[in-house]
């Protein structure tokens, strides 16, 4: 191939091709048409000779490359050129003569590739056949291991079953021995009973009817007490109904205190009749009946229905939570309206209501403890040796929650508020304005102590870290302040879980700037009747004496 290439490089036709093209280009304008055509044909003939030599060199080069080399180059570059560039017959003959070796080379390469593929498939099949026995052997060993493990597991389970059978046999023997001993003891008891039956048993026969009669008498006494309570309730309701029907409306304009005084007179008559009937029916068990002062105001009196004990704890809890929520949303706002007529500062009003709520819970819990002690003393003689004594005490308390002396608790709360240094204000204002609110909170707190577990309010102190789990900030708070300035409403807790969130006011730096030395507060004497004007402002000056400084933290 190298010799042919050297001959082509030194051939006259290849060397004179460039010179002829240059001469033709220079003489093209002066030559005639025939002369130009002759020049062009001469160049084509010379180029054809060069191409024939190049194809010979191409064939030799492809043969030197072997079966696989140069195939892609010929396919991608030479074949498209041959299809588009040469259309004349003479050139076609030359191409056919030169292309045949290339086609033979392509055919040989295809045959070679197919033979290589067949050899590869055959080698793969031989390797699979060789690896199949080893795979079968591995499967056999694995199945043998599984069989051995199953055998060991079955042996272990068999041993466990045998051990369990032995234990059951031992238990059966012990039970048989116990049964034999029981039969022997029963036979001995029968023999003793038969011996004792021969003795006179008049005394024993006389004791049994006495026990039955005493039980019937206790049951009859309880029924009579319930009947007396219900009859007193009925008579009180009938009397109040007759009074309301006999009372005619006045033609003139009524004063602002008319409806409130009328409601208080009705509640006073009802409470008086109920307390009188209960003191009559429970004279043996209750030594002190409820006091009925002229200023007694009962916010919500619940009838002592016998079905009260049957009410589930969940239903009572839901009702009390609803009452507590109503007290926050309605009764608290009413109390604020009353106090705002006398006090300008909203902070002082909210502090007064919060302290009243805390004191009411504290006093109600103390009253519940004393009430439970009295119930225990009363029920002890009739439940001696019984296992359900605590259940009986709880049922009695739930059934007789209306025996709670709420007015006495209201008086105690007002006394505690009078000596609290945080809410000292001018003497023209009296805490008797909050009697209805305090009485409602006391009744709610007293009833919450009868739940299982009881509900209580969370401890709160000014300056404590704000807890989002217990309180929500009021609308006028600084939402970036970390400390509580003062509390608006306490949080309701069940053990350590928050049932209802309270409300607190947070202000950054306000707690330290408003701290002032604690002054001695002036105690307020509490009279049964609170003289007030239209808005609860006292028109009669009352004597006040200095009292010692008390701890300002909330009591629980």
From Swiss-Prot:
Residues 179-214 have a biased composition (Basic and acidic residues). It is found in: Cytoplasm, Cytosol; Mitochondrion outer membrane; Mitochondrion matrix. Residues 113-126, 284-294 have a biased composition (Low complexity). Residues 110-150, 171-214, 234-313 are annotated as: Disordered. One of its GO terms (cellular component) is mitochondrion. Residues 129-138 have a biased composition (Polar residues). It comes from the Eukaryota. One of its GO terms (molecular function) is molecular condensate scaffold activity. Residues 1-290 are annotated as: Interaction with YWHAG/14-3-3 protein gamma. One of its GO terms (biological process) is mitophagy by internal vacuole formation. High expressed in testis and weakly expressed in lung, intestine, and spleen. Not expressed in spermatogonia, spermatocytes, and round spematids in adult testis but specifically detected in elongated spermatids. Residues 257-283 have a biased composition (Basic residues). InterPro entries: MIEAP, MIEAP_C. Keywords: Coiled coil, Cytoplasm, Developmental protein, Lipid-binding, Membrane, Mitochondrion, Mitochondrion outer membrane, Phosphoprotein. The modification Phosphoserine is found at residues 13, 85, 123, 127, 154, 157, 303, 305, 527, 541. Residues 152-184, 210-243 form a coiled coil. Key regulator of mitochondrial quality that mediates the repairing or degradation of unhealthy mitochondria in response to mitochondrial damage. Mediator of mitochondrial protein catabolic process (also named MALM) by mediating the degradation of damaged proteins inside mitochondria by promoting the accumulation in the mitochondrial matrix of hydrolases that are characteristic of the lysosomal lumen. Belongs to the MIEAP family. Interacts (via coiled-coil domains) with BNIP3L (via BH3 domain). Interacts (via coiled-coil domains) with BNIP3 (via BH3 domain). Interacts with YWHAG/14-3-3 protein gamma; a protein that also plays a role in MALM. This is Mitochondria-eating protein.
């Amino acid at each position: 191939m190298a010799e042919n290439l050297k001959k082509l490089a030194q051939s006259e036709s290849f060397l004179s091709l460039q010179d002829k093209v240059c001469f033709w280009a220079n003489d093209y304008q002066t030559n005639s048409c025939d002369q130009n055509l002759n020049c062009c044909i001469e160049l084509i003939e010379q180029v054809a000779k060069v191409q024939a030599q190049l194809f010979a060199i191409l064939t030799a080069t492809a043969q030197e490359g072997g079966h696989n080399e140069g195939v892609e180059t010929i396919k991608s570059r030479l074949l498209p050129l041959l299809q588009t560039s040469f259309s004349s017959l003479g050139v076609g003959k030359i191409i056919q003569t030169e292309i045949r070796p290339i086609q033979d080379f392509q055919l040989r390469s295809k045959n070679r590739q197919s033979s290589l593929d067949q050899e590869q498939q055959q080698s793969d099949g031989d390797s699979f056949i060789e690896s199949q026995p080893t795979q079968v052997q591995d499967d056999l060993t694995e199945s043998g291991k599984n069989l051995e493990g199953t055998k060991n597991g079955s042996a272990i389970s068999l041993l466990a079953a045998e051990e369990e059978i032995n234990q059951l046999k031992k238990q059966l023997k012990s039970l048989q021995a116990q049964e034999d001993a029981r039969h022997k003891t029963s036979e001995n008891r029968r023999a003793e009973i038969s011996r004792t039956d021969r003795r006179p048993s008049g005394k024993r026969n006389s004791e049994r009817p006495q026990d039955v009669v005493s039980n019937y008498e206790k049951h009859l006494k309880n029924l009579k007490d319930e009947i007396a309570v219900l009859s007193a309730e009925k008579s009180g309701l009938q009397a109040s109904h007759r009074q309301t029907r006999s009372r005619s409306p006045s033609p003139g304009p009524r004063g602002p205190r008319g409806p409130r005084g009328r409601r208080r007179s009705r509640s006073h008559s009802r409470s008086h009749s109920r307390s009188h009937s209960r003191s009559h029916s429970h004279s043996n068990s209750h030594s002190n009946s409820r006091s009925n002062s002229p200023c007694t105001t009962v916010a919500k009196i619940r009838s002592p229905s016998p079905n009260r004990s049957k009410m589930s704890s969940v239903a009572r809890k839901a009702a009390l939570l609803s009452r507590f929520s109503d007290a926050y949303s309605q009764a608290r706002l009413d109390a604020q309206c009353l106090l705002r007529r006398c006090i300008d500062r909203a902070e002082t009003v909210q502090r007064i209501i919060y302290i009243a709520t805390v004191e009411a819970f504290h006093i109600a819990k103390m009253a519940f403890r004393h009430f439970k002690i009295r119930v225990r003393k009363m029920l002890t003689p009739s439940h001696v040796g019984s296992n359900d004594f605590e259940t009986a005490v709880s049922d009695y308390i739930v059934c007789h929650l209306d025996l709670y002396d709420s007015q006495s608790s209201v008086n105690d709360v007002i006394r505690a508020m009078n000596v609290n240094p945080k809410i000292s204000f001018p003497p023209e204002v009296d805490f008797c304005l909050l009697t209805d609110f305090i009485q409602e909170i006391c009744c709610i707190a007293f009833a919450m102590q009868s739940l299982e577990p009881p509900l209580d309010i969370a401890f709160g102190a000014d300056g404590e870290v704000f807890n989002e789990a217990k309180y929500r900030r009021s609308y006028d708070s600084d939402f970036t302040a970390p400390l509580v300035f003062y509390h608006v409403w306490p949080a309701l807790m069940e053990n350590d879980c928050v049932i209802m969130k309270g409300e607190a006011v947070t202000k950054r730096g306000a707690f330290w700037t408003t701290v002032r030395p604690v002054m001695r507060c002036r105690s307020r004497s509490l009279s049964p009747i609170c003289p007030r004007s239209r808005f609860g402002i006292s028109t009669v000056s009352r004597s006040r004496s200095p009292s010692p400084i008390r701890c300002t933290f909330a009591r629980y």
